[in-house]
Amino acid sequence: MGLGARSVHARRASTLKRSGVDMEKKATTDFPIAEVLANRHSPRAFDPDAVLTDEQIGSLLEAARWSASSSNSQPWRLYVARRGTDLHREVFDALASGNQAWAGDPACLIVNVAKMVTEDGSPEKWASYDVGQAAAHLSVQATSMGLVTHQMGGFDKEAVRAALGLDEFHTPWAVIAVGPEGDPSRLSEKLQEREKAPRTRKPLEEIAPDWR
């Protein structure tokens, strides 16, 4: 995390803590990892007044653009729906009700779409894998900038497809909420409990058996 991002993150944390909110969700790891990876988390509380600049959004998209890609096919297509726009309303309306409970606050919703065929019309076998890598890059870049993300799979794909004017060869895989973190007190009591719960992961021995 750069000095600028550290400053933004620190100021934001200080503001929330003065409101009685602790936004620190750093992962507790068994081995050292990059700080930006440890700090990445997926809150539901976003600042409802924040607006992202073109430069900020451009940096997020640039990070996705330079993620790894099978045969350099780059099958991802990213559609930015800024809060207050018609596209944002259409994408928001396509979200599952559980996501709608909080996803109106983030500064923007970014739809991650996979192009499922190659230029010659054959199946793009690694498209879904590659768009996941693009989303991961975007999320880590957001963390480095003092922002947070929350990736959602709960949405009506056909409604999003219609909103974006996509053909049958392009599939929406995720909607990514992006913006500065907000005060969890805006959430329902149930979501506040989930927001404040400690982060957990399966043990290394389970996900990587016999690695040593």
Place the predicted regions along the sequence by residue.
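Acidic, surface-exposed loops and disordered segments
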Residues: 8-12, 16-212
